[in-house]
Amino acid sequence: MDNNLVDILVIGAGASSAAAVSNLSSLGVNILCLEQGDWMNTNEYPSNFKNWQTIRDQQFNQSPNIRKRETDYPINEEDSEIEVANFNGVGGGTILYSGHFPRMKPSDFSVKSLDGVGEDWPISYKTLEPYFAQNDINMGVSGLKGDPAIPEHELPLPPIAMGRMGEVIGQGFNKLGWHWWPSDTAIISEDYDGRAKCINLSPCNSGCSQGAKSSVDVAYWHKNLRKRGVELKTRCRVREILVDEKDRAKGVIYYDENGVECRQFAEIVIIACNGIGTVSYTHLRAHETRYD
């Protein structure tokens, strides 16, 4: 089945695509997002059950190789020094992240010049600063202003209260004479944007039943879909990126929620499927290219 041409096609409904759609929707264009996972049912999050630890470590494990949800895909980690942490669903990895939300530092953009490793970014912290600020507002970021180690910036919400573990760590840093500062967090410390403040309901890395943690399904996508021209289809698995004679993406072949093969064409294609899925999809093309 072939679908009509859209202006912008987005693959994946995680953090980067949520922000992209939020901005691009102001242009009055037609945007379609394809997500291979589902909308999350917050009643299924581990915090709703007495055996929450078991559920968190199994059905809501950060590794798809352990989770094995039908919308996941296995990842070979045999030769990797790190283990993958991701999630397939509306909200992407933010469903299971802890809400730890520090900004990049100016020095992070110049690691080659400053430290002799990696490569310098072609843009600076100053370039991204207004976008950091807008995203903090959209997400509902809480934090303590005034850290002298990073550029000063405004935050929409006061800091989340520090727990006993954080207090002990801070005391240790004080004894060592080390500078430390509570990190910005994407968890709302006060009622914000129609959501109730955090009540410490459960560990943040197992899904927030209350909605106080700013996963992008609650912070972005509900608002995105109220905008004219924006559509999100779930349980759609992209099989192949279609390209034109100039090797430019022009659409995709995907399987819809019923397993029907579909073609969707677009003027612009955005691949936003985390660090593994994005790279994988660049290899699922209609014909051979010379990309490394």
Feature annotation, model-predicted:
Residues 1-113, 117, 122-126, 130-133, ...:
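N-terminal glycine-rich phosphate/pyrophosphate-binding loop and immediately adjacent elements
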Residues 4-6, 260-268:
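Core beta-strand elements of the Rossmann-like FAD/NAD(P) dinucleotide-binding domain
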Residues 17, 40, 239, 276-278:
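Glycine-rich nucleotide phosphate-binding loop and flanking beta-alpha elements
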Residues 19, 127, 219, 277-280:
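Short amphipathic alpha-helical face segments that pack within enzyme cores
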Residues 73-74, 100, 112-237:
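Conserved redox-cofactor binding core of oxidoreductases
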Residues 242-262:
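Conserved beta-strand-loop-beta-strand element in the redox core of flavoprotein oxidoreductases
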Residues 268, 272-277:
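Glycine-/small-residue-rich beta->alpha transition segments that form the dinucleotide
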Residues 282-291:
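Conserved small/polar residues in nucleotide/adenosyl-binding loops
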